[in-house]
Regions:
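A short acidic, glycine-rich active-site loop
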Residues: 37-53, 94-105
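A structural signal for short, well-ordered beta-strand segments and their strand-loop junctions
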Residues: 70-72, 204
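Active-site-adjacent betaalpha module
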Residues: 1-16, 23, 28-32, 56-65, ...
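Short glycine-rich, polar/acidic loop-and-turn segments at beta strand-coil junctions
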Residues: 22, 47, 73-76
């Protein structure tokens, strides 16, 4: 695979959609439950949910351009024995009043607005990053991908860990700033600065859609 010191190649890119599951971004999901029951936690659901139309637009643009769309989802066993995160820190997980991203439950499903199409990969992870202990790298290499465009939630945790993992696997990374979000806007902005400084080209949805259209036109 080519060196990440070179710039991103949108013509050899894949869209990675991270954790757009009901428990993270649906108004009846686990994060929304925290926002209602523990407002002091500062979970900004409107900010998280504002990613949905941007992610949908990007997924449609990648499909139109003939580029792959790959879903990454965080799912755990009902007893949380395979979980790699202390969910009790945010009032979820073992002993909580409701399951959180448990495999086979509604909360762990990709939201209806962003359901994968036939033939699109769904990569299940147990921790934060999409590359750690998953087949993601093999899937991307098989498709000839050199650049990953990353969207989803949350900016400071699973999104940023996936970006860092991509760099470590020698991919060129693009982070779409209006298609990612954190539970807190201030920490979101801080993480975007870190990403732009060290790990990824930070773009808007409009910019990435234009890049895809330009690459498609160049092939024709």
């Amino acid at each position: 695979m080519e060196n990440t010191m070179m710039g991103p190649e949108i013509a050899k890119s894949a869209l990675l959609i991270v954790d757009m599951e009901n428990d993270f971004v649906h108004p009846e999901g686990g994060f929304a439950h925290i926002a209602r029951e523990a407002p002091a936690a500062g979970f900004d659901m409107p900010f998280l949910m504002r990613t949905i139309p941007h992610v949908k637009r990007l997924a449609d643009a990648f499909r139109t351009a003939g580029r792959p769309v790959v879903y990454i989802a965080h799912m755990v066993k009902p007893d949380y024995s395979d979980a790699q995160f202390p969910y009790w820190r945010i009032g979820l997980g073992p002993g909580a009043s409701r399951p959180f991203i448990v495999e086979g439950t509604w909360g762990a499903q990709i939201i209806d607005a962003l359901q994968p199409r036939a033939g699109e990969h769904l990569v299940i992870k147990k921790g934060f990053g999409g590359f750690a202990n998953t087949p993601l790298d093999t899937i991307l290499r098989t498709m000839g991908v050199t650049t990953c465009v990353v969207v989803g939630v949350t900016t400071c945790v699973c999104v940023s860990t996936t970006v860092r993992g991509g760099v470590e696997h020698n991919y060129r990374m693009i982070l779409v700033k209006d298609a990612v979000a954190e539970v807190n806007r201030e920490t979101h902005e801080g993480e975007l600065q870190t990403m732009a400084r060290l790990f990824a080209d930070v773009k808007t949805t409009d910019e990435v859609v234009a890049m895809l259209a330009s690459a498609k036109a160049a092939r024709n």
